[in-house]
C-alpha cells in the first residue's frame, strides 16, 4: 500500500493490526505519523541508556505474572505490569503518541530516545468497545513524562469483571542489549521501573 506500519506480533496480531491501521487511516495520514516519528528519534543512535517510569499508581508485578500468554510469554515484548489503584494513566516517557487504539483500551508511544512502548489498560478490555476510557491524547501528539494521557473507570470495570492489570511492554526490545526491571511492589507515578541498555 505504499507506506508501511510496524505490526506487533503475537496471538492478538489480527486485532492489533486492524486497530492500528484503522486509527492511522481515519485520524491522521500515515505519512504525517512517519514524519513525526522520524523527527522524534533524531537522538536514538546516541542514547546508551533510557528509563521507563511507572505510568499508574499501584503495584508493579513481573510481566510473567500477567494472566494472558500474549504478555506473560513475552510475545509482545519485555516489560512489566501494574495493578492500578486509580484510573489515571500518565506518560512513562517523553515522546510521541504513535497510535491510539479505536477502542481506547491501549496506546503505543515512541520515546524521544527510540523506545517503542505499548500500554494495554486491563485484560480483554477491548470487549468494552471504548466504554469507560477517556483518552486525553491523539496519534502524533508530543507528550512529556508524567503528563496525564488517559482516564478510565477503574471501579466500574472491576465490577463488570475485568482484570485491570495493565501491561507496559517495550515492543522493540530486540534493539536493546538488556532490559532491567528496577522495582517490584507499590509504586507512585514517575518512579523508575525499567532501565533499557543499548
Task: Show where each model-derived region lies.
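Contiguous, well-folded functional domains in the mature portion of proteins
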Residues: 38-198
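Membrane-embedded alpha-helical signal segments
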Residues: 1-44
Amino acid at each position: 500500500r505504499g507506506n508501511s506500519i510496524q505490526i506487533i506480533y503475537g496471538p492478538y496480531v489480527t486485532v492489533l493490526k486492524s486497530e492500528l491501521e484503522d486509527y492511522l487511516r481515519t485520524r491522521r495520514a500515515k505519512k504525517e505519523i512517519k514524519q513525526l516519528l522520524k523527527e522524534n528519534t533524531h537522538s536514538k543512535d546516541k542514547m546508551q541508556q533510557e528509563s521507563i517510569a511507572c505510568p499508574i499508581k499501584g503495584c508493579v508485578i513481573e510481566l510473567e505474572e500477567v494472566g494472558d500468554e500474549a504478555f506473560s510469554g513475552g510475545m509482545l515484548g519485555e516489560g512489566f505490569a501494574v495493578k492500578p489503584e486509580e484510573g489515571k494513566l500518565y506518560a512513562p516517557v517523553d515522546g510521541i503518541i504513535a497510535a491510539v487504539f479505536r477502542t481506547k483500551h491501549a496506546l503505543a508511544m515512541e520515546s524521544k530516545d527510540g523506545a517503542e512502548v505499548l500500554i494495554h489498560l486491563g485484560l480483554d478490555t477491548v470487549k468494552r468497545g471504548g466504554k469507560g476510557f477517556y483518552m486525553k491524547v491523539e496519534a502524533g501528539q508530543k507528550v512529556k513524562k508524567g503528563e496525564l494521557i488517559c482516564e478510565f473507570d477503574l471501579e466500574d470495570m472491576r465490577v463488570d469483571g475485568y482484570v485491570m492489570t495493565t501491561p507496559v511492554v517495550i515492543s522493540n526490545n530486540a534493539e536493546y542489549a538488556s532490559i532491567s526491571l528496577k522495582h517490584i511492589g507499590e509504586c507512585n507515578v514517575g518512579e523508575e521501573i525499567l532501565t533499557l541498555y543499548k
